[in-house]
Amino acid sequence: MNPIASPRRRTLAGLVIAAFLALGAAGCAQIQEAAPANGDPAVLAEVPGTDLHRITLTEHAVERVGLKTDVTAVDPQTGKLSVSYWAILYDSTGKTWVYTNPEPRVYVRQAVTVERINGAVALLSDGPAAGTVVVTTGAEELYGAEFDTAH
């Protein structure tokens, strides 16, 4: 009788294969359970009475996007509200916006009216008050998060 083909060895080989399959399936299940339940980098909350959203990002999302900010100011030559041109975001209808940063990791889109562009500075006839923190780098990503659009 061939020792490899004995019923006892076949049973043992079958048990070993079954054990490997069971352990492999259990390992896959553990990987799926280890994934975070809510891994969203951004949480949206409606701003009551508007069509706007308050966007709260995780610390990791802020770092990954590389958000940078500046403050609105009053232009000393014109007396007009001014903001870095890099803060201005144009939507698909041509309307102009900035994202304000009212508190750490929180961003809210606000409409602005650009009167004119002077180099790297946008002079505004309407917008957030002087001293308001606005996003200068990463506004497009915030817009994408707000409207759930892929980049």
Residue spans for each PLM region:
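Post-signal peptide N-terminal segment of mature Sec-exported envelope proteins
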Residues: P36-E59
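Exposed loop and linker-edge segments at protein-protein interfaces
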Residues: V121-A150
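Bacterial signal peptide processing site
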Residues: A29-Q32
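Hydrophobic helical h-region of N-terminal Sec-dependent signal peptides
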Residues: V16-A22
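Bacterial N-terminal signal peptides that target proteins for export
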Residues: P3-V16
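Short beta-strand/loop micro-motif enriched in small hydrophobics and charged residues
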Residues: G79-I117
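Hydrophobic alpha-helix/coiled-coil detector that fires on Leu/Ile/Phe-packed helical surfaces
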Residues: H60-V62, V71-G79, T100-V106, A139
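C-terminal motif of bacterial Sec signal peptides marking the signal peptidase cleavage site
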Residues: G24-G27
